[in-house]
């Protein structure tokens, strides 16, 4: 009897926050990860395991980072350059949570260099955070009260449902984008989302975009950014531009990466009407492939936002030894320039390997020019063109094919049949294994054969009516013959 009473009272010992289900862990995005962790692929010890294609992690250029560390042992050894005195004591003691000046200066220069110095970052406007997740949440706390809303173009990164909402109480209102124009953001779509928020009696505080897009793998065209900036200026709201994939954009200008701050600076009067309401989130997780270091940043020209975010950053600081190491690494300009160029080349090469492999088995992708993933159209493999059909296909791909990919519904895409497929967290050989598995699945699903009809359709399947998509396809994706010649 006593144990029964205790059992009934236990839930009351936790807060409502601890017991709520808004964290998003029940999303298929996270469920796929759980299945992978139960049965991870290994080419030697577990060759039939699940291949992780749901993780946007850059493992393509670790050798370059390790080579630099071997040449610069002082950085890891916590000594002055040239084998000088130890800095262990000063780093181990309490630090100002504004961050080490040497690191903030190096980070500001690196961010400016990534954008071709079309935007120059002021170190005093940078707030350091424990990754981009902390940066985005801190901005939510700074800009929105409980129940306020941010508009986010779809499809969007599934983790935003956790990062932006769970602890802050903020709401997300999707800006619905469609494959007909390559999922580009339009003013009518923004206006529609704003009206829907008003009908729900939500106060819209801003728009949040990822540029380059996660999950689309596309850098936002300047015209789209101008549309978004015009919208936030007209509504008197904020814009958060999550630019953590800025250094992965492998297309040459004008199809390459354009920062929201560059668009703001190009407005009449230097963007004075909106410059204090446009904020950038950055991290070193994607461009340098260092997610475990937990290094993120908020950049804002709004002094009040910088002050508030700095106070909040005390709950998620970047460790002093990490800052010291990265100050040395980012301070080596010759290295960072060569690293970024080579890393982009490797990303494009692996991207092309995935796109070519999918095309050969009759699966098309949205043409992309950035990121660590492709937005893949597998709708023709579904038994029904519905979200139930999408989930049925997803389960087959995870459990039968052994590939963890992310279904579009987890990214709030309105069109069933799209999937995010990552390519930079595995070797080329593992990607080949994934394509072999998928080919076998497609052959069995379509009755075998050479899938010639499917290959002709994969160009991409639902975006061929968009002139921009065709232009990107011709510019960014080499022919299969070219890829084989390179190999």
Curated annotation (Swiss-Prot):
The modification N6-(pyridoxal phosphate)lysine is found at residue 286. Its EC number is 4.4.1.14. InterPro entries: Aminotransferase_I/II_large (IPR004839), Ethylene_sulfur-biosynth (IPR050478), NHTrfase_class1_PyrdxlP-BS (IPR004838), PyrdxlP-dep_Trfase (IPR015424), PyrdxlP-dep_Trfase_major (IPR015421), PyrdxlP-dep_Trfase_small (IPR015422). Keywords: Ethylene biosynthesis, Fruit ripening, Lyase, Plant defense, Pyridoxal phosphate, S-adenosyl-L-methionine. The keyword Lyase applies. Catalyzes the formation of 1-aminocyclopropane-1-carboxylate, a direct precursor of ethylene in higher plants. Involved in defense response by producing ethylene at early stage after fungal pathogen infection. Involved in several phosphate deficiency-induced adaptive responses, such as lateral root elongation. This is 1-aminocyclopropane-1-carboxylate synthase 1. It comes from Oryza sativa subsp. japonica.
